[in-house]
Amino acid sequence: MVKRSKKYREAAERVDRNNLYTANEAIALLKSMPAYNFDQTVEAVFRLSVDPRKADQLVRGTVNLPHGTGKTAKVLVFARGPKATEATEAGADIVGDDDLIAKVQGGFLDFDAVVATPDMMGKVGRLGRVLGPRGLMPNPKTGTVTMDVTKAVKDIKGGKIEFRVDKNGNLSFLIGKMSFDESALDENFKAVADEVKRLKPATVKGRYLTKATITSTMNPGVPVDPNTLA
């Protein structure tokens, strides 16, 4: 059995496990919990009644957080020539072509997001086993395979996040830091909840979003009533 810290136990005692909270209430409760000497990350987790093994129920997409995540993403871009220059000028942290592909294949993973121009995807595709499991593989559907590398880089730097349901039907999102005010966290939470609802597969009947939780790095999750997200 995991032994929890005194602060964690104190925080857990504040959560009524027989109650489901609104997002506002959950955020306020989370911010009232004992403080730590670092700025905790705040996360939203949703449980969906989907079967990710079915292609038409694989919920994935992107969302722009109105207040960002509180972390500036480190962006890697696979491009060459003028497009590589554009990516660098747009603020990409790492830019390259064949040599960079080899470097990533060799284990380099010090980045948070990946963008590629279409002409690079023939070779970038070889990195599927490295990038795929980490949710970093560029994809046209999420705007990360594109000739407009300037927009892609600036969107990611500005708070655009990518998501994909896991094998158990869960979606996790970073929605900010504990230093954010409550309204900013609430607006970020609503942005991701609205996008998740918008992407409900047509083949899913009945309740789709079955569970929602807001949590932070060191604190227990606070359950949010899915009915309040309608």
UniProtKB/Swiss-Prot annotation:
Q: Which GO terms describe its cellular component?
A: large ribosomal subunit
CDD domains with a match to the protein in the record: Ribosomal_L1 (cd00403)
A GO molecular function annotation here is: tRNA binding
Q: Name one GO biological process term.
A: regulation of translation
Alphabetical keyword list: Repressor, Ribonucleoprotein, Ribosomal protein, RNA-binding, rRNA-binding, Translation regulation, tRNA-binding
What this chain does, per the entry, is described as: Binds directly to 23S rRNA. The L1 stalk is quite mobile in the ribosome, and is involved in E site tRNA release. Protein L1 is also a translational repressor protein, it controls the translation of the L11 operon by binding to its mRNA.
Q: How does it assemble?
A: Part of the 50S ribosomal subunit.
Family label: Belongs to the universal ribosomal protein uL1 family.
Q: Which NCBIfam families match?
A: rplA_bact
* Listed name of the protein: Large ribosomal subunit protein uL1
> From which organism does this entry originate?
Bifidobacterium longum subsp. infantis (strain ATCC 15697 / DSM 20088 / JCM 1222 / NCTC 11817 / S12)
